[in-house]
Amino acid sequence: MAARLAELGRSAEWCCPMLPVSPLETIALAESLVAAAATPRVTVIGSSLGGYFATHLAEKHGWPAVLLNPAVVPQRDLSQYLGEQPLWHGGGSMVVEPYHLDELRALGVASITRPERYYLVAASGDEVLDYREMLAHYPGARTTLIEGGDHAISDFEQYVDDVLAFCDTEDLEPPAPRAAGLIR
């Protein structure tokens, strides 16, 4: 994604921070980065657990979201990974505590409110998460179902322009607040 945006001269539009282990700290970090950017348009993109966070942010703030093989019930899926875990990118490790699962539960979105705000990219060959849960959780969302594939969406370059086109869609912004009126 970063490489494609650089090719298009749009690198300044991209931010992909290293996320803290705490889900609540992750949400706070994302919100602070958006506030600091002071941009009128925001689309959050999240893969796996990042898709869960993106869904929370989309519902809380009305932002459009692109979800790449998103986790739907991560507190269930991650309960078997309590304790020290290796970091898959960059080396090192992190410690997953039981309270992290509680934080995830608190961020859950039972159902999305405006499916047109979402673009789901799900791979039927995801070896980590069940794509059918993803499809069921995002009814009505724009969806690309990759036949086969994997959790990392290793062939993402085939979909990056579709993702960018969705991000550039003008009518995904939250509706303007309506003026309250007195009904007689």
Predicted regions and their residues:
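Short, highly selective alpha-helical patches that border small-molecule cofactor pockets
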Residues: 2, 54, 131-134
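Active-site signature of alpha/beta-hydrolase-fold catalytic machinery across serine-
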Residues: 56, 60
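The alpha/beta-hydrolase serine catalytic core
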Residues: 64-184
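Active-site catalytic motif of lipid deacylating hydrolases and related acyltransferases
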Residues: 1-40
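Gly/Ala-rich beta-loop-alpha elbow adjacent to hydrolase catalytic centers
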Residues: 45-50, 54
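Structural motif
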Residues: 41-43, 64
